[in-house]
Amino acid sequence: VQASSGMADLMRRATDKPTYAPTILADKLCALTIVYSVLAAVVHQRTTSRGQRVEVPMADTMLAFNLVEHLAGHTFEPAIGPMGFNRSMTEGHQAVRTADGWACVLPYTEKNIADFFRAAGREDLATDPRFGDPASRAKHYGELYDEIGKLSVEKTTVQWQKICAELSIPFAPVLELEDAETDPYHTGSGLVSLAEHPTEGTYRQVGPPMILSDTPPSVRRHTPARGEHTSELLAELGYAGEEIANLVSPVSA
């Protein structure tokens, strides 16, 4: 799906190699699309008393996801430029090294950019016309990110975090997965918690990330063993006890 939707090609444009996203991106994205598609059909059914067939093709879903910004110059007919969102495809559009680690720093507005360069002691870059307006920046993203990368190594991650917070510049230290899980922000929300499985013992579970004021979500069931819900699902579909027993019992040779 990543290959047929252009995702692997986007990775090639960014890394020179058509690699896969390091997560089960298509599965997760299509699952979310299925959820809101089914909910839309439920709303329609409750309004009109009519059901309908819901299809969510994985390749189409991924392609639509990619083309939102990467249609780019092919948005118009005839095309006025290449496909691919220029800023995302620019070399250097990535985390930068600090004096003691890595961080993501993204001065976005003219003020952000000028403030960042002034904080780094580079008044010349703060007033550089290449970065002074959106049209000029679009032609010089590579140089902008290159200059940020050169300056970021002059201070520690904590120093940059403090500076960027004071100047309202988007910034975040790069956390390893292990550190992200135990970061105070995430532990405070209770996103990852310990639970007891009836057969497998203690395990970590990832809870719902959303917050609902009146109906807060929670994890109500443990991670199922293979086939654990088969009988329950068949019963919901209208199968009787004996039919279920025949369906779930091993087939004899």
Task: Give a label for each model feature.
Residues 1-103, 107-108:
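Active-site-adjacent "lid/gating" segments in soluble enzymes
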Residues 2, 29-33, 107-111, 143, ...:
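Conserved active-site and cofactor/substrate-binding residues in soluble primary-metabolism enzymes
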Residues 38, 49, 116, 164, ...:
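Residue-level signal for nonpolar/aromatic packing positions in well-ordered secondary structure
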